[in-house]
Amino acid sequence: MLSATLRLLSLCPPESRFAVTLTRMQAWPSPPIRSLPGHGKPLRIFDTATSSVRELAPAVTARLYVCGITPYDATHLGHAFTYLTYDLAQRVLRDAGHHVHYVQNVTDVDDPLLERATRDGLDWRALADREIDLFREDMTALRMLAPDAYVGVVEAIPMIVDMVVELVDRGAAYQVDDDLYFSIATAPAFGEISHLSRAEMLAICAERGGDPRRTGKKDPLDPLLWRAHRPGEPSWPSPFGPGRPGWHIECSAIARHYLGGVIDIQGGGTDLSFPHHECSAAHAEVAAGIRPFARSYVHTAMVSLDGHKMSKSRGNLEFVSRLRRAGVDPAALRLALLDHRHTEDWEWTPGLLDDAVDRMNRWRAAVALPTGPDAMGLLAAVRERLADDLDAPGAVAAVDAWVGAALADAGGSAGAGPDPTHQGGPVRGSGGDVPAWGEAPALVRRLVDTLLGVDLEPVRPRGS
């Protein structure tokens, strides 16, 4: 009966099923990408599903989907480190000659958001808007490449419902009371991303938004597709009654709508490999009848503070906005993040920022010199390191070596040479309009900007 009803209602045009006004979410302004001589190398990156470093072999256009924030608190350094991973992946792919179609979602309706809004006496939409605005500011300051589509779950409700309808028609969904669940028995590849045992899955599922103990489910691991309306909660009309989507189906539907077919990377933090990426891939594969959902599943390691993973629930957070308000140069903060492999957990300490500021000062001093060692070797080295599983620390070390040689040749003086902000005419043979006062330092400034996203322009005092 349920399936027949959904088939009938799914024939109705979306505008008749959803009498709501949806506003398209806007991303932040993307920093410019400047050209470099030659082309970069193909990206080899660690794929969680195969537990190996594999060459990403996209078509002309690479398709990336990265899970975004739940906007109930400010951006912390764990978030920043995660999004840096996919910023670097985009830069490497673009440098290798690919176009990149990058989609990121925002979970702008979810239990943690609703709970925080209730606790603070705020409208949940106002809280989400405030934190999304702050996230945009942080991403802009850190010079993260913006997604081509920045999509809120609320605006994606129609496409999410359409995918739920497909899953019902394929016999992959069932009711528990008024809620809809997905049957993992219909997804033969379930578990092949995270490679966890069933006991591990059950334990993690309970910790990360699942409800394995709910009675009436066919399998304790079956994830929620559609949560029927509860008093005091937001809801939207659908063929199966008012409610709101489950967490995992949101990304499945948004990724398919904006990227289609098989995508090249599904990305996020390591804490998303299960259940989120496992379930969202299962939804997409069963709905479309196509496997795999993604060619590579890429996960960024965790950042700790005081011995524990940074998390909103624990409250051990270092916020990007707080550091910016304290006067920290965002370029130095980005450089501190770049000094860590995306596959390795690490701990944040204030000393890391001090080291990054010192490094930034040396880099800026070196590119301000009138001349320096040949930079083409450095360009090749940075490309080599980043193409090898986004080895940002290796790329940073290569720049350090060039900077050390440049400063040594100049006698270690940071004041040598003309004003680095003066731009002369272009010099031929360097791949673009590099300043005439020094081809090598100018190329280094350009490659550090383009490949690492670090702006080596000197910081000017406010009001100057």
Curated annotation (Swiss-Prot):
The keyword ATP-binding applies. Residues 410-435 are annotated as: Disordered. GO terms for cellular component: cytosol. It catalyses: 1D-myo-inositol 2-amino-2-deoxy-alpha-D-glucopyranoside + L-cysteine + ATP = 1D-myo-inositol 2-(L-cysteinylamino)-2-deoxy-alpha-D-glucopyranoside + AMP + diphosphate + H(+). One of its GO terms (biological process) is mycothiol biosynthetic process. GO terms for molecular function: ATP binding; cysteine-glucosaminylinositol ligase activity; cysteine-tRNA ligase activity; zinc ion binding. L-cysteinyl-5'-AMP binds at residues 67-70, 82, 105-107, 247, 269-271, 303. InterPro entries: Cys-tRNA/MSH_ligase, Mycothiol_ligase_MshC, Rossmann-like_a/b/a_fold, tRNA-synt_1_cat_dom. Its EC number is 6.3.1.13. A motif ('KMSKS' region) lies at residues 309-313. Keywords: ATP-binding, Ligase, Metal-binding, Nucleotide-binding, Zinc. It is an enzyme of class 6 (ligase). A motif ('ERGGDP' region) lies at residues 207-212. Zn(2+) binds at residues 67, 251, 276. Gene3D superfamilies: Anticodon-binding domain of a subclass of class I aminoacyl-tRNA synthetases, HUPs. Binds 1 zinc ion per subunit. Belongs to the class-I aminoacyl-tRNA synthetase family. MshC subfamily. NCBIfam families: mycothiol_MshC. HAMAP family: MshC. Monomer. This is L-cysteine:1D-myo-inositol 2-amino-2-deoxy-alpha-D-glucopyranoside ligase. It comes from Frankia casuarinae (strain DSM 45818 / CECT 9043 / HFP020203 / CcI3).
